[in-house]
């Protein structure tokens, strides 16, 4: 089962996305702050991190750099989520992000369909096992 750490300061977005990911067959843990994300990444060793860019205390780019600097978390794939324009996408990729998704295009109003489709493709590219529920289109 693919383990995902979802990091976003919006409780609503975390809950809605966590439910959709769990229904699709992913194992999910969540964090609302950057420092909590770093701790959970070390403890849970997720396969993938969905990381918001605007976090309180420690920004998404700071979290990304800290993850990639730590040998224990450096190999975890990080997908950047943001409500901002993708101006900085190439810099974030240079810092270690494997993909960049705009929150406005995630389909939160439709059960996160767009996110789940994009995530299934990213999981395939990373050669992780797509959950059976996701592969079946649930």
Description of each model-found segment:
Residues 56, 74:
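The feature encodes the CheY-like receiver
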Residues 15-19, 23:
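Charged docking surfaces used in two-component/phosphorelay signaling
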Residues 8:
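Conserved acidic carboxylate
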Residues 25-32, 40:
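Short hydrophobic/Thr-rich beta-strand motif most characteristic of the beta2 strand and flanking loop
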Residues 108, 112, 120-138:
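CheY-like receiver
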Residues 44-50, 55:
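Active-site beta3 strand of CheY-like receiver
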